[in-house]
Amino acid sequence: MVNAALLDICTNASQFRCNFSSERGGITDRPFMISRRHFLRFIAGLGAFSASTTAYGFGIEPVLRLRVARYEILPPQWPADFQLKIAVVADLHACDPWMSLEHIQAIVERTNALNADVIVMLGDYVAGHRHVTRYIPADEWAPVLAGLKAPLGVHAILGNHDWWDDKTVQREGQGLTISRRALEAVGIPVYENDVRRFTKAGRPFWLAGLGDQLAYLPARRFRPVKRIGVDDLAETLAKVTDDAPVILLAHEPDVAMRVPARVALQLSGHTHGGQVRLFGWSPVVPSRYGEKFAYGHTREKCDVIVSGGLGCSIMPFRLGVPPEIVLVTLGGKASA
């Protein structure tokens, strides 16, 4: 019905009548002439814009673009004279053709070139959508990630898709995920409600990794589930045994509303910046708090940085939020 009406307009209408203001401000009822040729050009222009935007969102931004998002901050809990550089890799979603092994290798090289003190990975290593030519198995992408190098090491947590895509773990309600086993097999520690203390030039800090907050969401198809997440914020922070500042890794950012001021910085991914972000706004954000934790730097009781991530989930489409590696500088220059 709609298509027939549009066709009738395009083929039969030779003019449109509308009221418009004269130079003296009056309203006239003279016909405002739009030729069929001009109208069809307008429609064709809209179609071309839509087609080019779609092509860019599918074929260019998610595959060919890669940027470094830099943050220089000084949380109240962080010593002003203690500089620490953290490189953040989030939401790879390994699959062909959108996140190939060659693409992951390029990300590894770009990350290493940042010369960060420590590298953290925030989960979602598996594809997370069906629009692929090949799912890249963990025993292929994990060895590539093993090429990441930093003086204080490379440290990882898991994301919801690392849990959701592991059907055995979902059915049994327990066990180590394929992603975790693959990362640990290549020497990358995976934190699940655990912490580790580090020092740089004699200055201490803690790295805390939270279990995923949505881990067993698909398991509800197989059996009743008492608790969806495997996260335990209180247990995790209870393992911090002194007053050195804490950096919390949490795949989903929503936990920030419960994170106490004891934590200096929370690093999260998951949202992909909405995957479509125009003029600082994302129409769809996988967060209970909408735009609040969609992307970038904000502050609750602690500072929170949400990465736009590197890959795609649901659909291999990005517009206005290019894939990114994040580099956070705490203290030092950030305090100036």
What do these predicted ranges mean?
Residues 2-34:
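N-terminal secretory signal peptides
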Residues 247, 252-330, 334:
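Conserved beta-sheet core of the metallophosphoesterase superfamily
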Residues 166-188, 200-246, 256, 318:
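Binuclear metal-dependent hydrolase catalytic cores centered on His/Asp/Glu-rich metal-binding motifs
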Residues 26-50:
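N-terminal secretory signal peptides and thylakoid transit peptides that target proteins
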Residues 89-90, 119-124, 153-160, 191-193, ...:
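Active-site neighborhood of phospho(di)ester-bond hydrolases with catalytic His/Asp-centered motifs
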Residues 75-86, 188, 195-207, 299-304:
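Beta-strand-turn-beta hairpins that frame and shape the catalytic cleft
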Residues 85-181, 186:
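Membrane-embedded segments
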Residues 83-93, 204-214, 247-250, 303-309:
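Active-site-proximal beta-strand elements of phosphoester/diester hydrolases
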